[in-house]
Amino acid sequence: CIREWRGDTHFAILTSEDISRVQAGILHDAHLNYGGWIAQSRGADAEAITQAFADLESRGLAQDGVVSTAGLAVRELIEERTNELTQRAWQSFGLENTERFLNMVEPIGERLMKRIDDTAGPNWMPAARERRP
């Protein structure tokens, strides 16, 4: 429930910033250094990606088909706002409960990610992955 609430909050912030789903994929891709994969993996075709980049460029968030420093800053701001708005749920859950919960689910998550890597490849489930160098 907490995870879904965080996702819903994240989408609400994206909407409030007038960032489309394709633009969100492009910004997230740049943040994780995925090489242009995320927006396509979420169903955006070349035309939608081109239009999304044009919209980002008109706002100074991209230049020549590359997300700019300003675009990365907006992506980070959205993440920070999401964290700020959703931290209360974890605080009310408490540190001890959170640690017990993480100790229980992290091994399952690690096995799931290994299975995804083995079957679908290392690009799937970008939200569950660390930023690439």
What is each stretch, according to the model?
Residues A48-A62, G71:
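Basic amphipathic alpha-helical segments that dock to polyanions
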Residues R88-R131:
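Terminal interaction helix/tail motif
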Residues I2-Q51:
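Short amphipathic alpha-helical interface segments
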Residues S20-R21, S68, G94:
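Ser/Thr-centered flexible coil motifs
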Residues I78, T82, T86-W90:
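Long amphipathic all-alpha helical oligomerization modules
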Residues Q63-R81:
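Accessory beta->alpha helical hairpin/"wing" motif in late/C-terminal subdomains of nucleic-acid enzymes
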